[in-house]
Amino acid sequence: MKIMSVNSGSSSLKFQLLEMPQKNLITSGLIERIGSNNATFTLKNQNHKTSKTLEIKNHQQAVSLLLTSLIENKIIARLEDIDGVGHRIVQGGELFQDATALNDVEIAKIESLCDLAPLHNPANLVSIKAFRQVLPSLFQVGVFDTTFHQTIPVKNFLYATPYAWYQKYKVRKYGFHGISYQYITEQMQQLLNKKDAKLIICHAGNGVSLCAVDSGKSIDTSMGFTPLEGVPMGTRSGNIDPAVIKFIAEKENKGIAEITDDLNKKSGLLGVSTISNDARDILAEIKKGNPQARLAFDIQIKRIVDYIASYYVLLKGIDALVFTAGIGENSSFFRSEIIKRLSVLGFRLDEQKNEVQGKTSVITSSDSLQQAFVVPTNEELSIACDVLRIYKKVKK
């Protein structure tokens, strides 16, 4: 079966086409700046990569271009060769406990959740509808970033705000990066040969979050009602005193929406360092002795360590700490700065093993009382696996 995994933004569309259940990558690509006359379309096929700039007015045109290119490049013979498409959808609220086949009813449910994720769900829906318009008979599945966290107990997900906020508006912790956490959890269960493994997973890219996992289930996570909660990230502040919003509104004569935008897009590593939201740039500046870059980095690391310590207590000990995603997989310095702060819990780093980049490896020493791993995530493959599972369930 050929299954496509799609991750759609407001002006972008990232995709992979995989052969399932063999899990072989056939091709991948990225369409950026949708809605402009200088959009870019990049297609990678085995060792061959093509890129072109052209006008792409909307997502429907982007999807048409993508599917036509697959035929033109002889990746597929006809559109019907694609058996299913899986869409990453950021917010599933409490309505979705699993990935789901997409029909009018399910799409309407996703639309009803747009006020919970106004930056993400509308873009996801545009992509779903574009595929429907171009290829109406295509089997489509929604895979949600929040689903994995639906196992979090109420005492861990509910805020101590007026209970009516939850009853009326479903204000609660939802958590994100769930597709990644699902994949890493399954990888670690196999690696440790232990279904009831207790894990703390640190997903560290431009967005950063942590998750406490017990026996394959999320029991707590650092992101909350939105991805803004938790640790400082590339441009997000992470946790702050909510009273700061009113204070800044009065001092700067700003509205709530503008301040929220500042917290989402102008804070975190970028806000404190005043240099960049990219951790690679921050690490390069630290090597040059830049104190502001060091401060931004130290604040982030401190908060990550706080969550790890908290989840260690919550889980009553762990089988493994796992680093994944861009920085988690590729920065030995990032990992070492965290591990050395966890020596009180019995973590001992193996400096040589920690030099690993982008492949599965244990990074703690043989005399370490705790194990830490690097495990590359693969959200696209996880989505494809969900599509295959739902396809078999629906089509049997």
Swiss-Prot record:
Pfam families, alphabetized: Acetate_kinase
Active-site residues per Swiss-Prot or TrEMBL entry? D145
Task: Kindly state one GO CC term assigned in the UniProt record.
Answer: cytoplasm
Localisation: Cytoplasm
Q: Which free-text remark accompanies the cofactor?
A: Mg(2+). Can also accept Mn(2+).
**The EC number(s) this enzyme carries:** 2.7.2.1
Q: RNA-binding: is it a keyword of this entry?
A: no
Q: Name the UniProt key words of this record, in alphabetical order.
A: ATP-binding, Cytoplasm, Kinase, Magnesium, Metal-binding, Nucleotide-binding, Transferase
Broadest EC class? transferase
Q: To which pathway does this protein belong? A: Metabolic intermediate biosynthesis; acetyl-CoA biosynthesis; acetyl-CoA from acetate: step 1/2
Which residues of this UniProt protein bind substrate?
R88
Give the required cofactors. Mg(2+); Mn(2+)
Catalytic reactions of this protein: acetate + ATP = acetyl phosphate + ADP
- Can the keyword ATP-binding be found in this entry's annotation? yes
Q: Per its UniProt record, what SUPFAM superfamilies does this chain match?
A: Actin-like ATPase domain
Please provide the Gene Ontology terms (biological process) for this protein.
Answer: acetate metabolic process; acetyl-CoA biosynthetic process
Where does the chain bind ATP?
Answer: K14, H203, A204, G205, N206, G207, D278, A279, R280, G326, I327, G328, E329, N330
Q: Name one GO molecular function term.
A: ATP binding
* HAMAP family with a match to the protein in the record: Acetate_kinase (MF_00020)
Summarize the protein's role: Catalyzes the formation of acetyl phosphate from acetate and ATP. Can also catalyze the reverse reaction.
Q: How does it assemble?
A: Homodimer.
Q: Which family does it belong to?
A: Belongs to the acetokinase family.
Q: What is this protein called?
A: Acetate kinase
